[in-house]
Amino acid sequence: LTAPFVLCKKVIPIMEEQGAGTIVNVASMASTAAGRGGLAYTSAKHGLLGLTRQMSLDHGRTGVRINAVLPGPIATEMIARVLAIPQHPVTMKMGMSPAKRPGEPIEVAQAIAFLASDDASFIHGAALAVDGGYTIF
């Protein structure tokens, strides 16, 4: 949480001077719910979402847009190990989610690119879930 805070505080004045800028924070599906054994991680991600929304409110009128993506399970080595366990809660829940698969890193990158683009010019302080519907239920 410290790094995004410090980076935002450094870059926002430059963006305001330019009259425009976009920040996309990478949070997590843990930003909106509690998880097993993740006190520090979940607390930090909740904090990052709060930081995103508050900074968006504080700086949006100066032309700076600040949003966040909330990735769910993404196809990484860690998730592959988890999904190899049929009875793991993540494996079971993913099987019930609309996408029924982990996301690909490129799918998160595309969401970030969208939020950073002019096509998202009316989006401020948003938390875009990129999770294949994992957090619907």
Residue ranges and their predicted role:
Residues 60, 65, 123-125:
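Short, small/polar-rich loop/turn modules that mediate ligand/substrate recognition or access, typified
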Residues 61, 73-96:
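A glycine/serine/threonine-rich, flexible loop-to-helix segment
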Residues 33, 112-113, 124-137:
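Short C-terminal tail/terminal secondary-structure segment
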Residues 97-108, 119:
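A conserved structural motif in NAD(P)-dependent oxidoreductases
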Residues 8, 44, 52:
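Active-site helix of classical SDR
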Residues 28:
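Residue(s) in the substrate-gating loop at a strand-loop-helix junction
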Residues 34-42, 54, 82:
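Active-site loop-to-helix junction immediately N-terminal to the catalytic Tyr of the SDR YXXXK motif
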